From Swiss-Prot:
It comes from Shewanella sp. (strain MR-4). Belongs to the N(4)-acetylcytidine amidohydrolase family. The active site is at K20, T23, E73. The keyword Hydrolase applies. Coiled coil: none annotated. One of its GO terms (molecular function) is N4-acetylcytidine amidohydrolase activity. SUPFAM superfamilies: PUA domain-like. Residues 6-92 form the ASCH domain. Catalyzes the hydrolysis of N(4)-acetylcytidine (ac4C). It catalyses: N(4)-acetylcytidine + H2O = cytidine + acetate + H(+); N(4)-acetyl-2'-deoxycytidine + H2O = 2'-deoxycytidine + acetate + H(+); N(4)-acetylcytosine + H2O = cytosine + acetate + H(+). Its EC number is 3.5.1.135. This is N(4)-acetylcytidine amidohydrolase.
């Protein structure tokens, strides 16, 4: 089970503003549960910047990503597909972690 989660620094402001409300992860990073509070740090330097509460975790296929997923990531669908392919090249099975910022 994950006890913290990291994001690339480029997503920090989107998370803090509430514009980014989901993250797509591989199976290794999907072991969280609804109601769990996770400290959030930057991937680059492990700097804590907030806490999030997990709302739900659902499997989703890369080929089934939609404009709604992209909007929840604060991206266009082509941007989202490109970013996912950079992070998880060739991976079809993803897990959507929906979250909210803990104030």
């Amino acid at each position: 089970m994950l006890t913290k989660i990291t994001f690339f620094e480029r997503f920090e402001q989107d998370i803090l503003s509430g514009a980014k409300t989901i993250t797509l992860r591989d199976e290794a990073e999907s072991h969280v549960f609804a109601g769990q509070i996770l400290p959030v740090s930057t991937f680059e330097d492990d700097r804590w910047f907030c806490d999030i509460e997990v709302i739900e975790v659902v499997p989703v296929l890369f080929s089934e990503l939609t404009e709604q997923h992209a909007a929840q990531e604060n991206m266009t669908l082509p941007e989202l597909r490109r970013v996912i392919q950079e992070i998880y090249p060739g991976l079809e099975q993803l897990f959507q972690i929906r979250f909210c910022l803990v104030q």
